[in-house]
């Protein structure tokens, strides 16, 4: 399935490692298009067996799935004028760590054009408490197939 995954950058983090490992193992035996979109350009900490694009390319990413993992990336994807399905895979509850505008977080989490997937059952209560929305799915480890099947 045609998929773009948004990352902050390609430097080392637990989530980047998980995503790059998943992509590299998936594209080895698949003809599906999978690419990365990075919001900050950095040197990758590992080989990436997929195309890497800048965020401005998302407007021309049609008929696919765009997966973001941060609230601010989800805001960017929701603003794209394409017909791709938008997914927020909440790896961490970043709005509780980084200072963010409550209205921005609320608007993203309550947007019905965004499929909401969380990594842990521990994320369900804060989301429900903040915006009275249940996640569409819980996917414990980042897996393209599990995310696709949950949509």
Model regions and ranges:
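A short, active-site helix/loop in glycosyltransferases that binds the activated sugar's phosphate group
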Residues: 76-77, 114-135
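Short hydrophobic/aromatic-enriched beta-strand-loop microsegments
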Residues: 85-91, 134-142
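Residue-level marker for well-ordered alpha-helical positions
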Residues: 20-21, 103, 121, 125
């Amino acid at each position: 399935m045609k998929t773009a995954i948004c990352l902050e950058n390609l430097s080392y983090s637990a989530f980047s490692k998980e995503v790059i490992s998943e992509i590299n193992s998936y594209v080895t035996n698949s003809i599906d298009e999978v690419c990365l979109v990075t919001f900050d350009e950095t040197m990758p900490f590992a080989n990436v067996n997929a195309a890497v694009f800048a965020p401005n390319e998302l407007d021309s990413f049609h008929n696919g799935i765009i997966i973001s993992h941060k609230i601010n990336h989800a805001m960017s994807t929701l603003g794209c004028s394409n017909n791709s399905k938008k997914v927020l895979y909440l790896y961490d509850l970043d709005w509780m760590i980084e200072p963010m505008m409550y209205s921005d977080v609320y608007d993203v989490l309550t947007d019905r054009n965004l499929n909401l997937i969380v990594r842990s059952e521990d994320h369900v209560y804060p989301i429900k408490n903040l915006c009275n929305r249940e996640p569409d799915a819980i996917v414990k480890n980042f897996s393209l197939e599990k995310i696709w099947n949950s949509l």
